[in-house]
C-alpha cells in the first residue's frame, strides 16, 4: 500500500510539473514580443562642420597712372629723328666776344655765364667755343666734316652717315635751338673724348645741373641720342629738370619718355 501511495504521489508531481511547463510554453508562445530584440536606436546624424567659405582676397588698389607733363620750349627735342620746329625763334645774347663771338638764348645766357665764372673760380679754364648756329653755319660744318672724311679715305657714299654721328645734319642740331653750348678746357683745346679727363669737364659734369644744364650726350648713349659721346656739349633744360635728369642718370630722350606727352 505504501508503494502505491508513493507512485501516485510521484505521478501527481510529474503531472504538476507538466502542467507548469505547458503553462509556461503557452505563455511564451502567446507573448512573442517579449523575446523580440529591441530595435537599435537610430544613430544621431553627425553634424558636419560647415566648410568655411574662402576669404576673398582684397582687390589691389591700382597704382595711379602718373600724370604726364606738358612740354615747354626749354624741353624741345632736336635730334636725328626730330628736326628743329619750322617756326622756331630765339632771342640771343652774347656770351663770348672772342673772334666772331658766341651767342646763346637769353633765357639761359646768365646761367651759362655764372656757371663759367664759378668753374673758373674753382681753378679751371673753361671756354665757350660754340653756341647758337644758323642753318648756314651748321650746313658748312656738316659739309666740312664729310670732306675731311672723304679726304681720309672714307667712301663718299658712306661719308654723310658717318659725319652725322659727330656733326648733326642741318636742321637736327641743338645748337640751332640756341640752348646748347660747347665748352672746352683751354689746356686741352680739342673736341674729343680726351676732354673728359680735364679738370674743367670734371667740374662741369658734377655741377652743371645746378645751373640748369645737362651733359647732353653721355658716354654709352649714342644709340639713344643718335650722337657720339661729347664730353663738352651742354644743354639748358631749366633748374628743376636738370636736377631730375642728373639724379636719374638718364638722357633727355629717356627723361621725356618717362614724364611727358609723346611728340605728335
Where are these regions (language model features)?
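Extracytoplasmic cell-surface/polysaccharide-interacting catalytic and binding patches
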Residues: 2-264
